[in-house]
Structures are given as C-alpha cells and as structure tokens.
C-alpha cells in the first residue's frame, strides 16, 4: 500500500474508528492540508464534533454505505475483521492502510522525525518535548496520545521539518515509522494478547532501533537493562539518560510540597542547568531527561528547555487535577499497568493529605489475567482501593478472570479493597467514606474518570 502525503491531495480518505485519539489526529492533519476526509465511529464524542467543524463527513455506526465514494480507507489494529466497512473495501479493491502505515507515510514528508516509544510515559514525554520545541520556535507537527492544552487538543500542524509523535509497540505498529530520533523510555510486559513474552517485546524494540539511520539518534534510559542492551547494539548515534552512569543525568534532586522535582541537569560531568518541573513524581524526572536529550540533539538553547519544562502542565489524564469538593482533592490518571499504578501512587505520597482512595478500573481481560500477580502488588501505597469491573475495550469476557478475583487477591495481601459494579456504586461508597484532606484518585484507561466527575458534581 502507498500514500504520498504531498502528491495525493485529490484523494478522499476514510477513517474507520475516527474518534480514537490517534486516528482523529491523523484525520485533522489531512483536513488542515486540504484533503477530503470522512470517518465512522460507534458513538458521538467531542472529538467528532471538532472534526465535523473542520469539514469531515462523520458517520455514527459502521456501514458499507459510508465508503462508497472514497479512495483510501485507514483502519486501526482494534478494528475486527468482520467490520462491514473493512469487508466492503476489500471486496471492492479500495486501497487499505492500517493506522501505523499511514502515519509512517506522513512522516516520510519530514526530515527530523522524533518517535517516542516505551511501555510507559510516551504521552508525557511527547507533551514535554512539544512544549520545549514550541518555546524554541521549531514549529513542529505534533501527534500526541492525549489532550494537550498548549496545542488545543491532540495534534498540531507545523510548517517545518520537525515531526513529533508517539510510537506504540502494539502489533509492531512503530515498525512502520521513519524515525530520525528514536526514544525508548522503558520496556515492560504489556500487550500480551499479541506478544508471546517480554523477550519478543524486547526484540521488537530492537527492530525499532534498527529503523534509525546511521546519522540519526537513539535515546534510551540506562536504568532499564533491556533498553541499555539495545543502546549498546545500536548502529546509529546514541544518547543515554538516567540517575547515574548515563550521558545525561539528574543530580541533587529535591521535591516540593506539590510533589514536583527540582534537580541539576548534567551531561557527563558538566552541569548544564538547574530545573524545577511542574509535573509531579519521580518518574517525570526521567520523562524530562528524555525530552532534554532530544532537545540537545536539535541544539535547543537551555533557556527554552528550562522554560518549556517548567511551564509544561502535561496532558490530560496524566495525574490531572480535576478539582476539590468538601476538602477532598480529586485527581485522574491514565495508569492501567502495574508499573504505572505504582508510580501514580508513589507520586500521591509526595502530596500532603490524609488517606488515599484509589478507584481502579482494570483495562482488558488479557492484561488483568497475564499481569494478575503484578496487579496484586501494585496497591500497597493506597489506603483504600475501590475496584470496578474490568473495562473490556476491544475484548470479550472469557470468564477466565474478573475484578472479584482481583479483589479477593488484594484483600488476601492486606489491601483494604471494596468491589463495586457501577460508577454510581463507587460514588456512593466514596461519599460515605472520604473525609476532608483525603485524596481521591481515579485510575485506569477506561471510563473510570466519570466517578471523579460525579463526585465533584455532587449536590449541584
């Protein structure tokens, strides 16, 4: 399949699942470049409303009628084979491209492509780098897996050769990209509905690194042994970061009352500058270092790096302050992997409060089943866990695992855990349990945020 972003502007492109965070960004890039765009999704959303206003033809529901006048159909890995639009496109020889291939074809039109990969932190790192490059007037095109206030959403159209995007390993999607700078934040066991094990995942990240040209750069975190090994084997230029034994390091770290870090940035033994982040948590020091490494490659001046990071508020759903009611602070976070949950709860410890209520909604049956033991060890920093039913997303319930099973295992390890089966049930429990100066975290990649929003709106 082929698509030339510059030459194919007379084509009409249809997106199956256009309401997704990545697909909507790609659709917006085309709309802003003069393309005719259509798309379908299963329910209405604010994203779809924005795309309509930009000129896209939007359909709610999937039907072959939606694609009878299109030249190219773009679909995601989450679209099932029995989707009627996908079937019609195949039967009628309409050109098809998956999302990753399509994004790769757009990247071809840029020289300085930055692809940010890793099991955790991609959106935050992309947000930080976006802030820096905008401060430095590099005028980048940006595709981010979350809503970022500084660009007014999940995409930005630039007019320069700089292109910044997240690079997801699910179904080897990022192997369709053309990175000049590749970032590997970390490697972890995830997407085990597709990968056999962590070794296969690591091998795929190695293949991603091999995509970088010899004059390009691979940036990686040396505290992750698998990333360190890929850095060692890389054929391109490399730049490592970490707390020690790396090219770029953070030293003399302290935290303020909001949980945000201040530290000195060193390259080898030379101090470059000192910095205070506006994103809380120790893990965000590493995210900042990765974005600093990219900035150094592009010769961004230190003042722009400092300003970009100190003013970066991050993307929505990344330890996002939602509000306060009756003295209870509500924060929402996208964490859905045990490592991410631990980082989120560790961050919450740095904020003065009494009890931490963690409302967690597991995301997919496969992840809950394959990482079950890891999930049972992820919540020790929460005073109470309110455990919702599993959010199925792209899967069907096989009956092999449930939130009740996870609740039993957590209670067996001494975690105070209450199972609930709806947003309203979670809300009622919290209304009766949370007290002034408590912290309420809604955690997960599904729709658990609704619980926090309803809690904030109680009595209105």
From Swiss-Prot:
Gene Ontology biological-process entries: cell division; cell wall organization; peptidoglycan biosynthetic process; regulation of cell shape
Subcellular location: Cytoplasm
Molecular function, one GO term: ATP binding
GO cellular component: cytoplasm
InterPro entries reported for this sequence: Mur-like_cat_sf, Mur_ligase_C, Mur_ligase_C_dom_sf, Mur_ligase_cen, Mur_ligase_N, MurCDEF_pg_biosynth, UDP-N-AcMur_Ala_ligase_MurC
UniProt EC number: 6.3.2.8
Pathway(s) this gene product operates in, as recorded in its UniProt entry: Cell wall biogenesis; peptidoglycan biosynthesis
Coiled-coil boundaries: none
Record key words, sorted: ATP-binding, Cell cycle, Cell division, Cell shape, Cell wall biogenesis/degradation, Cytoplasm, Ligase, Nucleotide-binding, Peptidoglycan synthesis
Keyword match Cell cycle: yes
Amino acids binding ATP: 118-124
Reaction catalysed by this enzyme: UDP-N-acetyl-alpha-D-muramate + L-alanine + ATP = UDP-N-acetyl-alpha-D-muramoyl-L-alanine + ADP + phosphate + H(+)
Entry keyword Protein transport: no
Pfam families noted in UniProt: Mur_ligase, Mur_ligase_C, Mur_ligase_M
HAMAP family according to UniProt: MurC (MF_00046)
Similarity comment: Belongs to the MurCDEF family.
Function of the protein: Cell wall formation.
Protein name in the entry: UDP-N-acetylmuramate--L-alanine ligase
Species per Swiss-Prot/TrEMBL record: Clostridium botulinum (strain Eklund 17B / Type B)
Top-level taxonomy: Bacteria, Bacillati, Bacillota, Clostridia, Eubacteriales
């Amino acid at each position: 399949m082929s698509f030339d972003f510059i030459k194919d502007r007379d084509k009409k492109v249809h997106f199956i699942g256009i309401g997704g965070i990545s697909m909507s960004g790609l659709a917006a890039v085309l709309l802003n470049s003069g393309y005719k765009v259509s798309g379908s999704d299963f329910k209405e959303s604010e994203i779809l409303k924005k795309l309509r206003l930009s000129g896209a033809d939007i359909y709610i529901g999937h039907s072959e009628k939606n694609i009878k006048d299109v030249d190219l159909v773009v679909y995601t890995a989450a679209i099932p084979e029995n989707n009627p639009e996908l079937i019609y496109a195949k039967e009628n020889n309409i050109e098809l491209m998956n999302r990753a291939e399509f994004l790769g074809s757009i990247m071809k039109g840029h020289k300085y492509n930055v692809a940010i990969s890793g099991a955790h932190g991609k959106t935050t790192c992309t947000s930080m780098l976006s802030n820096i490059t905008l401060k430095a007037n590099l005028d980048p095109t940006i595709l981010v897996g979350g809503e970022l206030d500084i660009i007014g959403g999940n995409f930005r159209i630039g007019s320069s050769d700089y292109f910044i995007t997240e690079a997801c390993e699910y179904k080897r999607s990022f192997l369709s990209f053309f990175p000049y700078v590749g970032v590997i934040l970390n490697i972890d066991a995830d997407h085990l509905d597709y990968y056999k094990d962590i070794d296969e995942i690591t091998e795929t990240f190695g293949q991603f690194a091999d995509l970088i040209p010899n004059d390009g750069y691979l940036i990686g975190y040396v505290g992750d042994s698998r990333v360190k090994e890929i850095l060692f084997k890389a054929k391109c230029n490399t730049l490592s970061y970490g707390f020690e034994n790396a090219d770029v390091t953070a030293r003399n770290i302290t935290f303020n009352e909001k949980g945000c870090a201040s530290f000195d940035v060193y390259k080898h033994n030379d101090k470059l500058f000192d910095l205070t982040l506006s994103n809380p948590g120790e893990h965000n020091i590493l995210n900042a270092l990765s974005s600093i490494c990219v900035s150094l490659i592009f010769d961004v001046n230190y003042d722009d790096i400092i300003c970009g990071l100190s003013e970066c508020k991050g993307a929505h759903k990344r330890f996002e302050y939602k509000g306060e009611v009756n003295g209870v602070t509500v924060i929402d976070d996208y964490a859905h992997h045990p490592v991410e949950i631990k980082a989120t709860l560790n961050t919450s410890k740095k904020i003065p409060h009494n009890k931490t209520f963690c409302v967690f909604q597991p995301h997919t049956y496969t992840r809950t089943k394959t990482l079950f033991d890891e999930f049972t060890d992820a919540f020790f920093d929460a005073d109470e866990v309110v455990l919702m039913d599993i959010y199925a997303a792209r899967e069907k319930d096989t009956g092999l695992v449930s939130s009740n099973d996870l609740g039993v295992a957590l209670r067996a390890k001494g975690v105070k855990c209450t199972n609930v089966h709806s947003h309203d049930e979670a809300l009622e429990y919290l209304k009766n349990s949370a007290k002034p100066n408590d912290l309420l975290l809604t955690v997960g990649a599904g729709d658990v945020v609704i619980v926090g929003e309803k809690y904030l709106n109680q009595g209105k």
